Amino acid sequence: MESENIISAADKARILAEALPYIRRFSGSVAVIKYGGNAMTEPALKEGFARDVVLLKLVGIHPVIVHGGGPQINAMLEKVGKKGEFVQGMRVTDKEAMDIVEMVLGGHVNKEIVSMINTYGGHAVGVSGRDDHFIKAKKLLIDTPEQNGVDIGQVGTVESIDTGLVKGLIERGCIPVVAPVGVGEKGEAFNINADLVAGKLAEELNAEKLLMMTNIAGVMDKTGNLLTKLTPKRIDELIADGTLYGGMLPKIASAVEAAVNGVKATHIIDGRLPNALLLEIFTDAGIGSMILGGGEDA
């Protein structure tokens, strides 16, 4: 037992030593985190995520959370007898569904995340893109193999982001938690894919990192091997041959756009792993797939 304790202590010391250069490097920087998947639904992972976010803040990194809520939205739609539909990875959202989306994201999911972070010593504040109208949206029309310009309801894309609200929260020492609902020119609500919001917000905040938490290890090739580094050219090839499809498309598109537009590192990581954020940011090997803005695949 004593030797196990010694090994454990040695491992902890090694981990801290490995983390120190990264803490120094990233202190004072912004990390935008897209929070979704199993990490949002499994109690142990939810608690671990909250602790990790608080730790990031304590070591000087400014985490900004953008959350999804697909399973929770689906559950509520099912309760009211509506079936969730998707086109090219985007949720079809009529007026009734939009009311439910906004209620679930802003009224339940956002508040739960805020409360969890605050329970572990953080100072999280929940906001929606309709607050101060800081996320302006326009209707998103989807192109499918069968038809171009398909209208899927109150689904939007980001037209512009005013980062003043989020920056103000960061300056006050708070952790912003953003529900991905935007506002149209007439004040109407738009459901925006959380990956798209996270990517655009990372660009506008000049974030050091964009981290997208998923239910997979990262981007995989057709044989199931993890691709640790990818360029836009390689991603185009993976889309063309059908390796990437469905719900991965908006995630990948957002990651690529962020990388091309100045976010220093964009990552797709496995949110099912305990301490996934810390493993990516504070270890030499990292985890998941890194999207590069250009050049050749490594």
From Swiss-Prot:
UniProt cross-references to InterPro entries, sorted A to Z: AceGlu_kinase-like_sf (IPR036393), AcgluKinase_fam (IPR004662), ArgB (IPR037528), Asp/Glu/Uridylate_kinase (IPR001048), Glu/AcGlu_kinase (IPR001057), NAGK-C (IPR041727)
EC number(s) per entry: 2.7.2.8
Catalytic reaction list: N-acetyl-L-glutamate + ATP = N-acetyl-L-glutamyl 5-phosphate + ADP
Keyword Kinase: yes
UniProt site (Transition state stabilizer): 34, 251
Gene Ontology MF annotations: acetylglutamate kinase activity; ATP binding
Binding-site residues, substrate: 69-70, 91, 191
Compartments it resides in: Cytoplasm
A GO term from the CC aspect: cytoplasm
A Pfam family of this chain: AA_kinase
Gene3D superfamilies: Acetylglutamate kinase-like (3.40.1160.10)
Top-rank taxon: Bacteria
UniProt pathway: Amino-acid biosynthesis; L-arginine biosynthesis; N(2)-acetyl-L-ornithine from L-glutamate: step 2/4
Primary subcellular site in the record, as a coarse category: cytoplasm
GO term, biological process aspect, one: L-arginine biosynthetic process
Keywords assigned by UniProt, alphabetized: Amino-acid biosynthesis, Arginine biosynthesis, ATP-binding, Cytoplasm, Kinase, Nucleotide-binding, Transferase
TM region(s), chain numbering: none
EC category name: transferase
Family: Belongs to the acetylglutamate kinase family. ArgB subfamily.
Biological role stated in the UniProt entry: Catalyzes the ATP-dependent phosphorylation of N-acetyl-L-glutamate.
Protein name as annotated: Acetylglutamate kinase
Organism in which the protein naturally occurs: Neisseria meningitidis serogroup B (strain ATCC BAA-335 / MC58)
Source organism phylogeny: Bacteria, Pseudomonadati, Pseudomonadota, Betaproteobacteria, Neisseriales
